[in-house]
Amino acid sequence: MKLRFLLVLLTLIPVSLSAQFAPEGGKPFVVEYYYKAKWGYADEFLQLFKKNHYPLLKKQVEMGRMLKVWMDQPRYHTTEDGRWDYRVTIVFKNSATAIEPFDEESLKKQLYPDQAAYQKEEQRRFAILDGHWDVPIKSVDLQ
């Protein structure tokens, strides 16, 4: 009897958790992407980002998949453990659009015919990073 109850309980937990954390489908969905470059490489990272990644994001805005993309950097320094160099904020059309499969590979081939050079520069862009993390954002109503 206890085993049966435990099995039923375990099958219900994922359903309740997914309902609790599911973003609202029709509203814009915001994700912040943080980049922490190795010391002395932030400018190189920015140059490679603008050359190879930003055009992909801009194209997706033009396609309507994303509503807006922008980059911020801190005005002042922080402690090393909390340091980040760039934050890219992407506003997706909705949460479904953010997670549904998207053929970014064909877009890369369209924008960057020299795939060998593109791959090499993208590898470099990530090699000079100390950290990268993504944070989906949920607005809090203060009223």
Regions found by a protein language model. Give the residues of each.
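Acidic/histidine-rich, surface-exposed loop or edge segments in extracytoplasmic proteins
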Residues: 25-40
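An amphipathic, aromatic/His-enriched active-site/gating alpha helix that lines ligand/cofactor pockets
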Residues: 59-67, 81-83, 89-138
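Primarily extracytoplasmic ectodomains and periplasmic/lumenal surface modules that are beta-strand-rich
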Residues: 39-44, 96-98
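Short amphipathic alpha-helical segments
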Residues: 43-68
